[in-house]
């Protein structure tokens, strides 16, 4: 995450480690430079930020000057706020193009998405409270980790509140972290209890 005066920016990544590290390293170098061509400080809005990050990603994964080497590709999610503008969240693809959240789909995912997506599709709405949205994200991670052993902790949880221009909460959760362990158990127990209340088939009465 990056927070300075008039802006707070959070960047997530998945994909090729070399490309992701190159992007993060170049972003830091541009921030430290006295006269950068572009940096997170000079971008006027999140479209410019997404284009800047996309350009860096494309530079690293573009091995022949024309096409992106998919083995070197990384995806990024960038979110946050610039003073005087609304909060933003965007997904940046390896070729440098990007999309933003919408009313129809007010969330974005990186990495292994299929196991945790159903809960997000069912529950995430724009009117959801920040706390409920965070719990939903953790349940999504929990579902993914139960179905795919290649996905595991730590889970880095970052909370940004609109117009604060700083990270209000930052946690790193493990399986045995009391809060996460309690959340995981209650979600599993709740699903089992709810499953027992589902309607019966007519033919079950014959058994």
Model-flagged regions — what are they?
Residues 1-207:
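N-terminal nucleophile
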């Amino acid at each position: 995450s990056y927070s300075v005066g008039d802006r707070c920016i959070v960047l997530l990544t998945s994909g090729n480690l070399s490309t992701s590290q190159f992007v993060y390293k170049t972003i830091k170098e541009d921030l430290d430079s006295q006269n950068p061509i572009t940096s997170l400080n000079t971008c006027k809005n999140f479209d410019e930020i997404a284009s800047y990050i996309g350009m860096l990603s494309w530079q690293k994964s573009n091995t022949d000057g024309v096409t992106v080497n998919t083995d070197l590709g990384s995806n990024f999610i960038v979110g946050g706020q610039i003073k005087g503008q609304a909060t933003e969240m965007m997904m940046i693809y390896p070729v440098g193009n990007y999309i933003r959240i919408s009313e129809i789909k007010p969330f974005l995912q990186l990495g292994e998405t299929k196991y945790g997506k159903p809960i997000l599709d069912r529950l995430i709405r724009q009117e959801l409270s920040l706390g409920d949205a965070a719990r939903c994200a953790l349940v999504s991670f929990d579902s993914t980790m139960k179905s795919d052993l290649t996905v595991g902790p730590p889970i880095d949880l970052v909370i940004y509140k609109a117009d604060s221009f700083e990270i209000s909460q930052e946690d790193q959760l493990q399986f045995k972290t009391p809060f996460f362990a309690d959340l995981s158990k209650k979600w599993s127990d709740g699903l089992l209890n709810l499953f027992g209340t589902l309607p019966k088939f007519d033919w079950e009465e014959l058994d």
